[in-house]
Amino acid sequence: ARRWVTDLSGDRVGVPYVKPGDEGFVRTDIRFSHEYVTPMAAIFWRDFVGAAEKVVDPGSIFFFRDHLTFLELAMTDARKAEGLLDVALELKKKQEEFAEEQGITLYGELPRTARNSIVQGSEAICHSKMLERHVLPGQVVIGSDSHTPHSGAVGCVAFGVGNADAM
């Protein structure tokens, strides 16, 4: 396994192989982010890359709204009165806007219905959906979720990153 990782990593960095202590940027196959991190990454993108710039290969990027989906049901009235729900809903809005601007797939919330106006759930849980539908053996995958290495079950290299690294 170590040989496979060093060979794969070398290929992604642009050298025959890597050894302990080497540094470089790794070319990924898939990137994904959830609603806590996407808005921060969008702000970094706008401020440091440029609002008019487009991400490279938006088809390989996926956004998820799965951590705060039921917040309006779970949050106490006292916390709502403090404005915390409004702040959380801004994260949702920012994520939706950035996905739209960049042409990135967003797994959002299930639609509300006329009969039931409350949140019905999320379209997907990020680390599960990636494993079920998107990742393939031999790929390099990064995600903003702590369960990102879950995708390694199919023989890919998958690891979690922070918001600045996600884009």
Stretches with model-predicted labels:
Residues 1-167:
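Fe-S-dependent hydro-lyases/dehydratases of central metabolism
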